[in-house]
């Protein structure tokens, strides 16, 4: 993995006077509002999708609602497969195209604004934050595991990412098209829903263990096991936006390092390059000093005056605007080009949805 961060080369200073912020930081309030809104959106999509599935399971009886293509945001593997297909053929896939557009939107978000998808939008990330809060109330704290073990465990998500990318990367365009056009591929979204509706004992135990682990170690799933987050982190290494510290304005209180959910040594660095940084701005919110810490673009060579430092920092409203640009841009572009919904008839859904539990993975069928 790439170098985590850029260390400060300036010598340590004596205790410096505090120049307090002119205005309180509202980044966390704004972020929590965005998280809540996206959580509600996902809840609405999930409820609509459930009603849509039940209509076909009942043989066409009851209320019919349209299939919300936005649920394909929960199909990152389909999004990756469709992206590979698009890059190989130049054709937009007919099945689960929304998965690809949302995938590309989230990747673009990470390319410009670090892993902001993980800390501002992802429902799993939001739930993980909630569980960490539960842990602080129940256990009195969350725990930091030894650094050597932490680094080793973080490698797991990259191994999972490598498995998926190597497997999908080795598939031809014809194989990708065949998989997505198979009954299993067509019903990938319904399969996902049924996993939660008909969860087995083993899956329930694993999820329960992950929930408990997330109350003990902050963002346990995201930090150690999420391959989607691993991909976003690698992409985010190229982001021009980073957490940047003004060594002269910093009073060396270390509040930023204590606030960082990823456990990064923000107080010892000039800029944070780590793939673990999610641009959550918790460190910025914790900083009591005016302009000492910013989520900011790289300074221009000509910019040396302290007054320009503040102008480089991204305010929460700008962060929200960038996130909205990539998310809504992907959705609106797909809708405008008529590539948002899968090209599958109602009759086909009527045949396939009730049979979803009997559908096997194509690779299993071949054997």
Model-predicted segments: where are they?
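Non-ligating segments of multi-cofactor redox enzymes
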Residues: 1-258, 266-267, 275, 285, ...
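Short alpha-helical catalytic segment bearing the HExxH-like zincin motif
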Residues: 278
């Amino acid at each position: 993995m790439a170098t985590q961060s850029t260390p400060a080369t300036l010598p340590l200073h004596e205790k410096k006077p505090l120049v307090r912020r002119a205005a309180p930081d509202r980044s966390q309030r704004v972020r929590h509002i965005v998280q809540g809104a996206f959580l509600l959106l996902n809840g609405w999509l999930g409820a609509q999708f459930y009603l849509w599935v039940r209509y076909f399971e009942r043989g066409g009886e009851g209320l019919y609602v349209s299939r919300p293509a936005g649920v394909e945001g929960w199909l990152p593997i389909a999004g990756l497969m469709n992206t590979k297909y698009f890059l190989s053929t130049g054709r937009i896939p007919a099945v689960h195209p929304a998965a690809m557009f949302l995938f590309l939107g989230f990747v673009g978000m990470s390319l410009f604004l670090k892993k902001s998808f993980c800390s501002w939008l992802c429902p799993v990330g939001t739930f993980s934050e909630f569980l960490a809060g539960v842990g602080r109330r129940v256990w009195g704290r969350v725990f930091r595991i030894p650094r050597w073990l932490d680094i080793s465990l973080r490698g797991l998500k990259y191994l999972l990412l490598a498995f998926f990318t190597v497997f999908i990367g080795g598939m031809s365009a014809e194989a990708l098209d065949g998989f997505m056009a198979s009954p299993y591929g067509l019903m990938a979204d319904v399969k996902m829903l049924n996993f939660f509706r008909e969860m087995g004992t083993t899956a329930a135990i694993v999820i329960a263990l992950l929930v408990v682990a997330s109350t003990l170690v902050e963002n346990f799933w995201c930090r150690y096991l999420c391959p989607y987050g691993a991909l976003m982190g690698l992409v985010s290494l190229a982001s021009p936006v980073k957490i940047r510290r003004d060594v002269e304005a910093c009073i060396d209180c270390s509040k930023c390092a204590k606030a960082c959910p990823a456990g990064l040594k923000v107080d010892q660095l000039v800029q944070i390059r780590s793939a673990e940084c999610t641009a959550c701005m918790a460190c910025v919110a914790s900083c009591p000093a005016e302009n000492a810490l910013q989520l900011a673009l790289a300074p221009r060579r000509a910019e040396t005056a302290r007054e320009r430092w503040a102008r480089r920092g991204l305010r929460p409203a700008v962060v929200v605007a960038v996130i909205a640009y990539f998310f809504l841009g992907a959705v609106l572009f797909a809708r405008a080009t008529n590539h948002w919904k899968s090209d599958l008839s109602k009759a086909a859904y009527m045949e396939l949805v009730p049979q979803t539990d009997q559908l096997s993975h194509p690779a299993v069928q071949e054997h």
